[in-house]
A protein has these predicted regions:
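Transmembrane helix segments
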Residues: 151-178
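Secretory targeting signals
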Residues: 21-53, 58, 88-157
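Aromatic- and glycine-rich beta-strand/loop motifs that create alpha-glucan
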Residues: 1-14
Length: 199
């Protein structure tokens, strides 16, 4: 645990980047506070950008901090399995922290505006974002450990991004993008706008 905290102190800038990624998704949907399902989907949907980023970061950090020669030299120290796991968990924790911050903000907004909760599908909606970030981080770490080349970084970023697009095209609800979950709400908002205009 101390090692994870040490890595978190060394990688504090990642927390800011993950917050920015959440902001980029949040700013596209100004009416999110009207619906609980939509709000939670936005928090989880930021993995469209966050997962490729975290995969690339983990691959980069493995190559920079623990190249294959270093891992081989330290293999007999008894902590070889912690060489990359502590670092990976630190990166994942920053991603989860950013998600938690925006989840709290979204929940407070929904409570204040008496948002509709009929579309909630718990716990599915709350789990997909953290799982997607964690899986992408470990994929980046594993790929960097198996393929000792700097090309691992752009390859992992592109591969994870394309995988997100593929899952989105399969229309798996709430998995990796907010778009599928918000289709019903979008239609309601478009219908309600003329009504408000003539009211």
């Amino acid at each position: 645990m101390n090692a994870v905290l040490m890595w978190m102190r060394r990688t504090w800038m990642l927390g800011i980047v993950f917050i920015i990624i959440q902001c980029l998704t949040w700013s596209r949907y100004q009416e999110a506070y009207r619906d609980w399902s939509w709000t939670i989907s936005l928090v989880q949907g930021a993995t469209m950008l966050g997962s490729p980023f975290i995969a690339g970061v983990c691959a980069y950090m493995v190559h920079r901090q623990w190249p294959r020669t270093t891992r081989r030299d330290l293999a007999g120290t008894g902590r070889s399995h912690h060489l990359v796991s502590d670092m990976t968990w630190a990166v994942i924790t920053w991603g989860w922290a950013a998600q938690a911050v925006f989840l709290v903000i979204g929940c407070v907004s929904c409570v204040v505006h008496h948002a509709d909760s009929s579309g909630l599908t718990l716990p599915w909606q709350l789990l997909t974002g953290p799982i997607a970030l964690g899986a992408s981080a470990w994929l980046g770490t594993l790929a960097a450990c198996l393929w000792d080349s700097v090309m691992t970084i752009p390859v992992m970023v592109l591969a994870v991004f394309l995988a997100h697009q593929m899952f989105w095209d399969m229309h798996l609800p709430q998995l990796l993008s907010p778009d599928f979950a918000t289709v019903p709400m979008l239609s309601l908002i478009h219908i309600s706008e003329p009504t408000r205009r003539y009211a």
